[in-house]
Curated annotation (Swiss-Prot):
GO terms, biological process: 'de novo' IMP biosynthetic process
Catalytic activity: N(1)-(5-phospho-beta-D-ribosyl)glycinamide + formate + ATP = N(2)-formyl-N(1)-(5-phospho-beta-D-ribosyl)glycinamide + ADP + phosphate + H(+)
EC number: 6.3.1.21
Protein's UniProt name: Formate-dependent phosphoribosylglycinamide formyltransferase
Stretches assigned to the ATP-grasp domain: 119-308
InterPro entries, sorted: ATP-grasp (IPR011761), ATP-grasp_carboxylate-amine (IPR003135), ATP_grasp_subdomain_1 (IPR013815), PreATP-grasp_dom_sf (IPR016185), PurT (IPR005862), PurT/PurK_preATP-grasp (IPR054350), PurT_C (IPR048740)
Family annotation (PANTHER family): FORMATE-DEPENDENT PHOSPHORIBOSYLGLYCINAMIDE FORMYLTRANSFERASE
Pathway in which the depicted protein is active: Purine metabolism; IMP biosynthesis via de novo pathway; N(2)-formyl-N(1)-(5-phospho-D-ribosyl)glycinamide from N(1)-(5-phospho-D-ribosyl)glycinamide (formate route): step 1/1
Domain of life from the UniProt record: Bacteria
Annotated keywords: ATP-binding, Ligase, Magnesium, Metal-binding, Nucleotide-binding, Purine biosynthesis
Keyword Transcription listed: no
Subunit structure: Homodimer.
Highest classification ranks of the organism: Bacteria, Pseudomonadati, Pseudomonadota, Gammaproteobacteria, Pseudomonadales
Length: 393
């Protein structure tokens, strides 16, 4: 049985977050509601989740010694990676020493690197994926492109949110896509994956939660990406029963192989009744922000319950719902958001402003949420709300 103590006392149940972005912030809020003591760690001060945690630390999370020092000092009951860019080898060591990593240190390690998770899905689990090659050099990359043909997609093996990702349509794109991939990787220059392009009808995120009572799937989330970065999402995505069953089979296989407890965002390509595995994140997913308005238990509440070993008997979905991001471009350390009355004037709308301390270039600073009678109406309403927000830099 789960027991939760008193925060800041010897009985406290402590959860430490590695990464403190907007997704972590929502999980922290859910844990705070359950009386959990929360420590937020990130590489910059005043990150969103730090603003709602009991305390925080600023370190380079790719520095294994620094990460170990914070974790040994805090002695958390649970370590929750919120981003990929972490010294995962240190998490593996800490897990072996008795710490609990959510969902598992191996899941964090495999999914930090596209190669690890792709080989697990395609080669070990024999799940359908796009054809692919890995390459370390421009020569090997050029050969991979030639082999797979156009169009194809190139991504750094270590990157997130579409950074370094390109769609190649002709030989003219080969050099510039390579250069962009080399700039966009999290660990600097290096290895890339080249994937054959799947001419899919749509892509989904199947939010899959592994909890004390088994595995539960949320209704499928449809989404629209630009340059690999999410712009809007909606739930439920209409699917054939065959495609949905196959999506659940693939998601169950991948999440079972990764093990542990928690929320997983399984990204899939769908064409008719066919399903291909794309990627998985062993944590809440940005496209799942829609669940803040579409479900009685959001993906963040589900993650919190799973972490703590609490039951998830049922997830209620409230009908057609959508999210639209509030994207800010420019430079500021004091961004302000105006015209919020107009943004929230329609019924069944909500906003989340993430409280990020600065914008330098283009950054997702918030999200608008909406429910309506149909997916089309919900998407349009969420977009109206998002566009109504007047951003002042």
């Amino acid at each position: 049985m789960t027991q939760i103590g008193t925060p800041l006392s010897p009985t406290a149940t402590r959860v430490l977050f590695c990464g403190s972005g907007e997704l972590g912030k929502e999980v922290v809020i859910e844990l705070q509601r359950l009386g959990v003591e929360v420590i937020a760690v990130d590489r910059y001060e005043n990150a969103p989740a730090m603003q709602v945690a009991h305390r925080s630390h600023v370190i380079n999370m790719l520095d294994g010694a620094a990460l170990r020092a914070v974790i040994e000092a805090e002695k958390p009951d649970f370590i929750v990676p919120e981003i990929e860019a972490i010294a995962t080898a240190t998490l593996v060591e800490l897990e072996a020493e008795g710490f609990t990593v959510i969902p598992t240190a191996r899941a964090a390690q495999l999914t930090m690197n596209r190669e690890g998770i792709r080989r697990l899905a395609a080669e070990e689990l024999k799940l359908p994926t796009s054809p692919y090659h890995f390459a370390d050099t421009f020569e090997a990359y050029s050969k991979a492109v030639e082999d797979l043909g156009f169009p194809c997609v190139v991504k750094p093996v270590m990157s997130s949110s579409g950074k370094g990702q390109s769609l190649l349509k002709s030989a003219d794109d080969v050099q510039k896509a390579w250069d962009y991939a080399q700039e966009g990787g999290r660990a600097g220059k290096g290895r890339v994956i080249v994937e054959g392009f799947i001419d899919f009808d749509y892509e989904i995120t199947l939010l899959t939660v592994r909890h004390i009572g088994g595995t539960t799937f949320c209704a499928p989330v449809g989404h629209r990406q630009e340059k690999g970065d999410y712009q809007e999402s909606w739930q439920p995505q209409a699917m054939s029963p065959v495609a949905l069953a196959e999506s659940e089979r693939v998601a169950r296989a991948v999440t079972e192989a990764l093990g542990g407890r928690g929320m997983f965002g399984v990204e899939l390509f769908i064409k008719g009744d066919q399903v291909w595995f794309s990627e998985v994140s062993p944590r809440p997913h940005d496209t799942g922000l829609v669940t803040l308005i579409s479900q009685d238990l959001s993906q963040f509440a589900l993650h919190a319950r799973a972490i703590l070993g609490l039951p998830i008997p049922l997830i209620r979905q409230f009908g057609p719902s959508a999210s639209a991001v509030i994207l800010v471009e420019g430079q500021s350390t004091q961004t302000a958001f105006a015209n919020l009355g107009a943004a929230l004037a329609e019924p069944d709308t909500a906003l989340r402003l993430f409280g990020k301390p600065e914008v330098n270039g283009q950054r997702r600073m918030g999200v608008a949420l909406a429910r309506d009678e149909s997916i089309e109406a919900a998407r349009a309403k969420a977009t109206r709300a998002s566009q109504a927000v007047d951003v002042k830099l």
